[in-house]
């Protein structure tokens, strides 16, 4: 079992190829439904306007299956020659940097955080992830929050949409106008990217603002807070022809603006397509009176933004490296713990089953009822020790010695002399994690690292204390 990050993005391939493999929310759900990964494998698929990537904890066979299914979604085979692939620490580093905006077209943009979070939540709903990926993605979220609050990486244009507005402002100014002042603007699409664009335009003195969407109600909902009007979807080509600037960002998988359908513009019209896949027929750029920019043009324009923010990159990367180290330490911690925890549970369960076999017939209870009762008792007795064990500092000498002692005490006799050293962790560059650890129900999803116990731990401790008090009371009455 290894960590993998694979995919296509603006760093390794062209916009045309990336959009071929773009997956809608429905296509991602279908991909999860069609996956048949090995036991304990976990995967999250991310598809945005600039990247389609998969983050996997699994085997090479699992990886081949994920790539094949993404390829099927694009109607072709997986492009091994242009796609990127990272594994283990490099894969974890890639996810942390993507989530923090370090790998975005607009360096430091914050929209990617919401997109990664949505991808994570979609995978959770599909049952695609368990303890390891839960921990990994919440580590990525912590990295993004710290980079945003502790560095200057996100200053200025904060998303693809806002960068598109800034690029349009510069283009219109260079064309002899007043930038965005007194312009007539049409927004085609009323999704998240469109709303972000309107927010970037909120303080501008526009001549007019019109929103066009397939759903008239949705168009009114988006336009109303900004004092905008709406036009029917069927009139979108005419609306664009009357505008100084058209921003296009729908969720369609095919172009929604077609060159032959566009009337000659009243004046020069700038069309900015920020959708993936592209929503505007490339032939629009050849029509007299129209200028078309897409994500490739935006990437070139944002090179200046990246240069201005370059000073913040080392600090942001340092934060990612710090949290990467924390995550790898946690993985090794879980890997070292797992044999000891399994040995403890196995020993207790063997004793439980032996005693049930000996005494179940005396209770008058059904065997299944006795099994459930004794299993519940065993889990409650082990809850606090196991939670305490998982909270021990993995870098302490006591941790290593304690784990070896526990394994020696509880390992089956045929394993006790196997000479296995739990103090030996895998090499940090190749964290081959073996079997994934079972999810600990007492671990918070976003641990703060402040040493405080979760509500579940406190509940387990209260139950243990109550049990001890009851036992003491019985002893007092009996004495």
UniProtKB/Swiss-Prot annotation:
Positions of the record's site feature: Important for activity: 94
Region annotation (Disordered) ranges: 417-455
Pathway where this protein functions: Porphyrin-containing compound metabolism; protoporphyrin-IX biosynthesis; 5-aminolevulinate from L-glutamyl-tRNA(Glu): step 1/2
Active site per UniProt: 49
Binding positions (substrate): 48-51, 104, 109-111, 115
Biological-process GO terms, alphabetical: protoporphyrinogen IX biosynthetic process from glutamate
SUPFAM superfamilies the record matches: Glutamyl tRNA-reductase catalytic, N-terminal domain, Glutamyl tRNA-reductase dimerization domain, NAD(P)-binding Rossmann-fold domains
Pfam families: GlutR_dimer (PF00745), GlutR_N (PF05201), Shikimate_DH (PF01488)
GO molecular function per UniProt: glutamyl-tRNA reductase activity; NADP binding
Domain of life: Bacteria
Protein family according to the UniProt entry: Belongs to the glutamyl-tRNA reductase family.
Matches recorded under NCBIfam families: hemA
Misc: During catalysis, the active site Cys acts as a nucleophile attacking the alpha-carbonyl group of tRNA-bound glutamate with the formation of a thioester intermediate between enzyme and glutamate, and the concomitant release of tRNA(Glu). The thioester intermediate is finally reduced by direct hydride transfer from NADPH, to form the product GSA.
Domain-related comment: Possesses an unusual extended V-shaped dimeric structure with each monomer consisting of three distinct domains arranged along a curved 'spinal' alpha-helix. The N-terminal catalytic domain specifically recognizes the glutamate moiety of the substrate. The second domain is the NADPH-binding domain, and the third C-terminal domain is responsible for dimerization.
Protein name: Glutamyl-tRNA reductase
Source organism of this protein record: Salinibacter ruber (strain DSM 13855 / M31)
Designated gene of the protein: hemA
